[in-house]
Amino acid sequence: IYRYSAIYALALSFALNTSSCSDFLQVEPTGSLTEEQVFEKIDNVEPLVLGLYKSYRGCKEGRNGLMPYLGTDETQQGNYQLISSGDQAGMDKYNGQLNPTSTQVSSIWNNRWPAVVSAAKAIYALGMTTEEPERAKQLMGEACFIRGLLMFELSMYWGEIPVIDMNRTDELGLGRQPLKTVWEYIINDFITATNNLPESYNSEPQRATVGAAWAMLGKAYMAAPEETGLRDFAKADECFKTIINMGRYELLNDYADLYRYDNPNTKESLFELQFNNVYPDCNYWELSLIHISEPT
């Protein structure tokens, strides 16, 4: 009897100690916020959304903004670049330098993909919050706009790409998704942006507006691969007519004014990245350090 009592007491003591240790090991961190805690407060989500602009802007710094256009009829390198940079030359000439080891190709992906993931987290968080519905609505529009932009550019290069949706992680995983799925997300992101974004901001010209969202939605309808069944020029036309009818935008009288570093955010601009002409806070264009706006 005593032996069994001793065994029972020992087992009970072990169970209590194990439970106590378990409780101790599961103490919430006090020096940092968990993602769940971040998602609870809209004040914690807004910096994540605003950081998306910085991430997207980083994709365009220096020569980065030119790389996706090399090999098209929009840009062409000079002989110096062709001689001095094999990786860069391959982007323009489609020669042996355009291969899986190209740092230029990998940088196009690596500069954008982390921001896609961050945007997906912000979208998930804003879908959960019940605080300040109007503010959350605008931030949702901004996060969707940036994710749509990034996925648009990545799919133009790689076609089938992964889709990050925090509500469908088990279903979608991390692998490439069919083109139709990819472009449904791109188009739906821009539709959300058109429904949620304001026409302007008081003193923050770098933020996405409803005009920019309509422009990108129109571009997405035109650019969607035919096999997706989503290409629709009639819908694109309606998007662009909506912009015209807003009465906020018009063409400049002098085309050259678009490229003046001291003339940012003109009445022709729908969405601009705020660069200046001083290295390293600049964007290269034809080997000049000038202000480049990237109107959609």
Where are these regions (language model features)?
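C-terminal motif of bacterial Sec signal peptides marking the signal peptidase cleavage site
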Residues: 18-20
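An aromatic- and glycine-enriched ligand-binding surface/loop that stacks and positions planar moieties
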Residues: 22-87, 191-192, 207-293
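Conserved, well-structured interaction surfaces
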Residues: 46-60, 84-158, 173-184, 190-205
